[in-house]
């Protein structure tokens, strides 16, 4: 299955909006992340974190992002929330024309009020198996696992692999794919890097000692796990102060290098390793011919660039209707090709050749002296 999202311009002027305070709903995965953080800190002999109490978890408006710290804050196991993501509120732009549209701000994308159509297609015929609409300010990775499970159960699909772009490369999504026994292949996004400094990949991680080794050879040891789900590693300031490579490593006033590593980083590394294999390259290549082509046909032939209605439910109906039309056209074309193959000259030529071989088979079969052939003769067609 291949999944991606595209934006539909909402029927709302981007200049007609109001600034409102909305409560940040914690993401659904925070309860599981909190349990992992508590277990990690307990194993290291650290005290448990104090967390605020708030409403039950639900899909986050912003969703997780691939960069560290974008998951929001962890929550308590009983109430999946946290101090950083629970009781806090954030200010957003809400359209006065279509309040359910989301104000989208993305790199190399138009700015304004949009809806997002999250679409999943199969890798054989590019038939649409799921389409889901969210406001434009929702991250692509937020509804992915829920929609993947729905598509698999709704049509009883025997899915073996999934292909996604780099926007879905988050620890939570990678963990969900691995735990579902799927072979995930995701695109690559070059990480941000400050000119003149070492890349993070130059710091080698040793899983045996749970530590990093810097390019100068110093060991960066584990210091603790924060409430965001990141393990923190810190160097020895006494050694870094005299290091000749310190200018390329850190500019902190206490001469200490800090590195963070997510608790579920090994899931990301496992998924990222698939991208470099021959199987991963073959699986990822049809993505542009399936889900990307599906969006292209929808925009060119079905008016999928603009939301024709206002409100999330009506835009969802528009996307479902567009997906149904595309599926009916594709199924009709596939059935027509199959019917044409039955009446093609190649089909009848192969049939005539098979009939001739069946006719010649008794003549070429050796007969025993006793009389009839030892092999049954095929009827002449």
Task: Briefly describe each language-model feature range.
Residues 1-381:
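Anion-binding and metal-coordination hotspots
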């Amino acid at each position: 299955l291949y999944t991606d999202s595209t934006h539909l311009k909402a029927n709302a002027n981007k200049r007609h909006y109001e600034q409102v305070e909305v409560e940040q709903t914690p993401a659904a995965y925070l309860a599981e992340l909190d349990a992992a953080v508590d277990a990690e800190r307990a194993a290291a002999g650290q005290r448990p974190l104090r967390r605020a109490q708030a409403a039950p978890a639900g899909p986050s408006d912003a969703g997780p992002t691939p960069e560290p710290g974008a998951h929001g804050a962890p929550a308590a196991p009983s109430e999946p929330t946290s101090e950083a993501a629970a009781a806090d509120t954030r200010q957003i732009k809400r359209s006065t024309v279509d309040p359910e549209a989301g104000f989208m701000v993305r790199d190399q994308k138009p700015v304004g009020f949009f809806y997002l159509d999250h679409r999943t297609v199969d890798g054989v015929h590019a038939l649409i198996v799921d389409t889901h609409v969210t406001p434009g300010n929702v991250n692509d990775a937020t509804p992915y696992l829920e929609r993947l499970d729905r598509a698999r159960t709704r049509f009883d699909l025997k899915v073996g692999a999934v292909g996604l772009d780099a926007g879905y490369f988050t620890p939570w999504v990678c963990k969900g794919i691995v735990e579902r026994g799927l072979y995930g292949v995701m695109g690559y996004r070059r990480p941000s890097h400050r000119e003149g400094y070492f890349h993070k990949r130059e710091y080698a991680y040793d899983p045996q000692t749970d530590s990093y080794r810097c390019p100068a050879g110093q060991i960066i040891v584990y210091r603790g796990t924060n409430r965001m789900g990141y393990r923190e590693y810190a160097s020895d300031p006494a050694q870094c102060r005299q290091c000749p490579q310190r200018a390329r490593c850190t500019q902190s006033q206490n001469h200490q290098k800090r590195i963070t590593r997510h608790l579920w980083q090994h899931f990301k590394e496992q998924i990222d390793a698939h991208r470099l294999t021959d199987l991963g390259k073959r699986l990822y290549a049809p993505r542009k011919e399936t889900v990307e082509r599906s969006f292209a046909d929808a925009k060119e032939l079905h008016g999928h660039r603009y939301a024709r209605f206002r409100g999330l439910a009506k835009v969802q109906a528009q996307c479902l209707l567009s997906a149904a039309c595309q599926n009916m056209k594709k199924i009709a074309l596939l059935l027509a090709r199959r019917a044409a193959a039955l009446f093609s000259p190649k089909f009848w030529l192969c049939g005539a050749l098979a009939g001739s071989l069946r006719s010649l088979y008794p003549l070429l079969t050796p007969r025993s002296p006793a009389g009839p052939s030892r092999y049954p003769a095929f009827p002449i067609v």
